[in-house]
Structures are given as C-alpha cells and as structure tokens.
C-alpha cells in the first residue's frame, strides 16, 4: 500500500505507516501536550478500539523521515446507521514536541485522500469543545460544524 507523502520545512518526507509489532511500543509512548490530554484518548486506547473494530478502524502512524511524530485513526463504515460515523477521523495525536510543524495537517489530508480513494463524498471529525480544543485546527482545514452533537462533542464535516 502506498500513502500520500509530502515535504514540510525542507526535505523531510512525511508518510503514514501501519502499526506493527516493531513500532507499537513507540506508538503507545506518544503523548500530546498536558493541556490536550482531556481532548484525545491515548494511542494505546485507540489501538484497543481498533482491535475490536477490524475492517472499520484505520489506525496509522505518522512519520517525518524515520521519526515517529504522531498517530491518526480514521473509520470507514459506509453502512453505519449514524451518518457521521460512516467516514471520519476518530483520533489525531501529534506528540507534544512535534506540534506546529504541519504533521497534523498532513495526517488529516492523508485520511481525506484515503476517503476519496474509497469513494467517499465527505468526512467528519468530532471534538470536545473547550479552551484548548482542536476546533480552530479543524476549522482551518475546512471542516464545518453540522449543528449536531454526539455525547457532548461537536460534529463537523468536510466535503471531499
């Protein structure tokens, strides 16, 4: 499988990679900034959720060159009765020391490219509102709140 690649700040090649026995430990060690912890689950929890939903969850690691810088998990479930869970981003964890370098944007764009490849017309993301929420980040990328909420989280959608 090949995934979108991009260059950010010089010659660093960004890529997504599957989680394997060789990188799962490092993936579980990724941590966001302390003020972000209430907004995103740890990678280990995300991987446990992915394990329980094979064929739906799409967990990937974000690399800048050989450095593991983040984790993203999407979901592709076209038959889901809840429309905003049919195609979307479930998690985005960029390690604290690697934020504000374009890696999160790359990860989201890579998920959207995968969604397009799968024939999806839109994708969603949910976030917990609050002072340090990822809302401004997702709005800058083109996601728009739908007016819906799920368990207190804002539902936003982007057309592909």
Model-derived features with residue positions:
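Acetyl-CoA-dependent GNAT
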Residues: 12-14, 18-90, 95-97, 110, ...
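Short beta-strand-to-coil "C-cap" segments at the C-terminal boundary of structured domains/repeats
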Residues: 157-160
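Conserved acetyl-CoA-binding loop of GNAT-fold acetyltransferases
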Residues: 138-148
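Active-site acidic-Proline motif in GNAT/NAT acetyltransferases
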Residues: 95-97, 101, 130
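Short, Lys/Arg-enriched N-terminal segments with co-localized hydrophobic residues
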Residues: 1-10
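Conserved GNAT acetyl-CoA-binding A-motif
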Residues: 115-127
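Conserved acetyl-CoA-binding loop-helix of GNAT-fold acetyltransferases
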Residues: 100-113, 139-140
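Conserved beta-strand-loop-alpha-helix junction that forms the acyl-donor binding cleft
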Residues: 124-135, 151-153
């Amino acid at each position: 499988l090949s995934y979108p690649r991009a260059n950010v700040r010089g010659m660093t090649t960004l890529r997504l990679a599957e989680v394997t026995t060789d990188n799962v430990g490092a993936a579980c060690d990724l941590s966001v900034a302390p003020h972000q912890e209430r907004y995103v689950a740890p990678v280990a929890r995300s991987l446990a959720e992915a394990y329980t939903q094979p064929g739906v969850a799409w967990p990937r690691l974000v690399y800048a060159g050989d450095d593991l810088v983040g984790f993203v998990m999407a979901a592709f479930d076209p038959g889901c009765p809840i429309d905003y869970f049919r195609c979307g981003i479930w998690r985005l964890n960029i390690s604290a020391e690697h934020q504000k370098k374009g890696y999160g944007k790359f990860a989201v764009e890579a998920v959207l490219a995968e969604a397009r490849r799968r024939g999806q017309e839109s994708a969603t993301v949910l976030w917990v509102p609050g002072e340090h929420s990822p809302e401004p980040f997702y709005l800058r990328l083109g996601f728009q709140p739908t007016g819906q909420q799920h368990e207190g989280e804002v539902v936003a959608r982007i057309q592909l």
